[in-house]
Regions:
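Edge beta-strands of extracellular beta-sandwich domains
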Residues: 63-73
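Short glycine-rich, low-complexity/disordered patches
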Residues: 2, 42-45, 114-118
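Low-complexity, Pro/Ser/Thr- and charge-rich linker/hinge segments at domain boundaries
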Residues: 2, 73-89
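Residue "hotspots" at secondary-structure boundaries inside conserved domains
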Residues: 16, 46-48, 140-143
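Secondary-structure boundary elements
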Residues: 89-148
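Cysteine-centered nucleophilic/redox motifs
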Residues: 119, 146-174
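Serine/threonine-rich, repeat-prone extracellular segments and beta-strand-based repeat modules
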Residues: 33-61
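Solvent-exposed, low-complexity, repeat-rich "mucin-like" stalks and linkers
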Residues: 1-35
Length: 174
């Protein structure tokens, strides 16, 4: 099952192009009397595209143009961008723990091998196997990355997922 998050932009960072004209900022478009709506509301200062179907509407006088768009955002995208916007509070906490661990353990200029070793060492020295290896009594959280990243204990799967998250967030190709 895929888990999705939102993609966030500042309204003024977007450029709009109509026909053969040069790209315009939102402010320039507004000065021309053109309105842009997202899902039936005026475009906010900060746009967060949540997964699913969305509708852009451009209104210029009596002319109305509508465009439906589909947005999806994968876990890997969130790791690469180091942005867990749109995930549940619990999910965001796990991403943030992975991002923090990367910030604390990965330095600019490290080789791929050095990054792998740093991630390995962090996970091995900062967490333990849950219940001293007695997996039958392990809580559900012990099977996800939050086990070793937040609770500081987990099963093998927890270590593997946490390693993957940290590796991708540190720029390794996984």
């Amino acid at each position: 099952k895929n888990i999705y998050a939102g993609v966030k932009y500042k309204r003024d960072s977007l450029k709009w192009k109509f026909f053969d004209d040069k790209p315009m900022t939102f402010r320039q478009i507004k000065q021309k009397g053109i309105r842009i709506e997202l899902d039936g509301k005026e475009l906010p200062d900060e746009i967060v595209y949540m997964p699913g179907e969305h509708t852009f509407t451009i209104i210029a006088g009596k002319q109305v143009y509508t465009k439906n768009i589909s947005v999806s955002y994968s876990v890997k995208d969130a790791l690469i961008k180091r942005d867990a916007t749109g995930f549940s509070e619990e999910g965001k906490a796990v991403f943030d723990a992975a991002f923090h661990a990367v910030e604390q353990n990965i330095s600019e200029g490290m080789s791929e091998e050095q990054k792998v070793k740093a991630i390995h060492d962090y996970l091995i020295y900062s967490a333990n196997y849950v219940n001293n290896g007695n997996y039958k009594s392990a809580e559900k959280w012990a099977y996800g990355a939050g086990g070793v990243l937040i609770h500081k204990e987990g099963v093998c799967q927890s270590y593997a997922i946490a390693f993957y998250m940290m590796a991708v967030a540190s720029g390794l190709d996984c």
